[in-house]
Amino acid sequence: LVDPPADHPGAYMPPAGDLSVPQFPVPASSLDRVASLLKSARRPLIIAGPETGGLPSEPLLRLAERLGAPILADPLSGLRAGVPDGAPVLDAFDAWLRSVPPSPPDFVLRFGAAPTSKVLNQLLAGWSDAVHVLVDLPGGYREPNGTQPVVLAGSPAAAAGALAAVPAQAEAGWRGRWLAADRAARAALDAASREPCEVFEGRVFTELRDLLPPGATLVAGNSMPVRD
């Protein structure tokens, strides 16, 4: 690798403080409206969608524990790795939601952009009886499914922290059913990827997940730059 000249624009690396994500508090009026809806929720579901830089794991996990809600984590949410063992984070739902649809939620709380999962987007559009809440930065409205959500404008961490103070609790067994289905699907996928067979490219992801240390960064790309 060749370092660029010191006066080249690409040689500048901003200090860490310049890379911090701006924090926006949640408007009190919007929070009061969402809190009143959340108090009556008995089947809450949290969707962690794609987000530049990843979503804040600790505030979302605290919120999930407080509400008794499962978190469906998109691959681009940043929540599929680095979370404690036993955290209510689901990562295999794309493999089972279509064939084993769960009881529909009555409250859907989505952070970030729309999920990349086609089946999850279809279900979101079909859960018309549920209350949909979209947490997005001020001025944002990343909602392609036509659910007409209540928008809670603010930073994900601020919104999760504020909602964790709402006295709400899911019905018994609600989160457990989601977790059991997802754990079973994950175990089946892992077992299938390790079965003796001809070369299976997908196995590399299973092995990397087990081998990489927490917080590791994996850089992946295609071969075009090499060929070019």
What is the predicted function of each stretch?
Residues 31-44, 63, 207-214:
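Glycine-rich phosphate/diphosphate-binding loops that line cofactor/substrate pockets in enzymes
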Residues 1-39:
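Conformationally flexible catalytic loops at phosphate/diphosphate-handling active centers
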Residues 32, 48-133, 141:
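Glycine-rich, anion-gripping cofactor-binding loops and their flanking helix/strand elements
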